[in-house]
């Protein structure tokens, strides 16, 4: 039985994971950590977990990694809003532990990323723009998924990513990300390839948080016997 530690257990994603975990017979939630805990509680939290699923805040990541290294606890990181220094911490930890990071753990969003990469190879001379829509209370903008998609495309086309074009004209070598916030939208991501004569749009819409939570649990199960490295959901789905 795989003992999973759930960081961010009282958040929306944490709640959904707790609702879905019984669907999986080979794992259980053995430890929980949330905003009511002291950071030093991460010590026992990591000690009692084989793999941690983290949907908390960037502020605790360094402490979480330190205790995970102490107890050789594997990490599945789904927290968004991470900055460059956080990714450096993940890369360093992955030299010792198996670490999986993804801004979006649903199979649909990762398939969208794969399709965008393939379309980019064919539509090399098309302009590319990304529009992401989320609920009114989402803190980070643009979404981590939108950044992931943009980075995937930009790496293939040699483009710069812009989040706020303002009043300036679109430059030839850029991919833009625009954000909408409102209602109770779980997440919509649209990638438009705009040519002179036609537009091709790829779209993924999450109808609820179930696909994210199922993906996170599958990631924890998959990671349990992997060697030290930094993984993504695309390693699981082999795309």
From Swiss-Prot:
Its main location: cytoplasm. It is an enzyme of class 1 (oxidoreductase). It holds the Pfam family DapB_N. SUPFAM superfamilies: Glyceraldehyde-3-phosphate dehydrogenase-like, C-terminal domain (SSF55347), NAD(P)-binding Rossmann-fold domains (SSF51735). Pathway: Amino-acid biosynthesis; L-lysine biosynthesis via DAP pathway; (S)-tetrahydrodipicolinate from L-aspartate: step 4/4. Its EC number is 1.17.1.8. It catalyses: (S)-2,3,4,5-tetrahydrodipicolinate + NAD(+) + H2O = (2S,4S)-4-hydroxy-2,3,4,5-tetrahydrodipicolinate + NADH + H(+); (S)-2,3,4,5-tetrahydrodipicolinate + NADP(+) + H2O = (2S,4S)-4-hydroxy-2,3,4,5-tetrahydrodipicolinate + NADPH + H(+). Keywords: Amino-acid biosynthesis, Cytoplasm, Diaminopimelate biosynthesis, Lysine biosynthesis, NAD, NADP, Oxidoreductase. GO terms for cellular component: cytosol. The active site is at 134 (proton donor/acceptor), 138 (proton donor). NAD(+) binds at residues 8-13, 78-80, 102-105. InterPro entries: DapB_C (IPR022663), DapB_N (IPR000846), DapB_N_CS (IPR022664), DHDPR_bac (IPR023940), NAD(P)-bd_dom_sf (IPR036291). GO terms for molecular function: 4-hydroxy-tetrahydrodipicolinate reductase; NAD binding; NADP binding; oxidoreductase activity, acting on CH or CH2 groups, NAD or NADP as acceptor. The keyword NADP applies. It is found in: Cytoplasm. Belongs to the DapB family. Catalyzes the conversion of 4-hydroxy-tetrahydrodipicolinate (HTPA) to tetrahydrodipicolinate. This is 4-hydroxy-tetrahydrodipicolinate reductase.
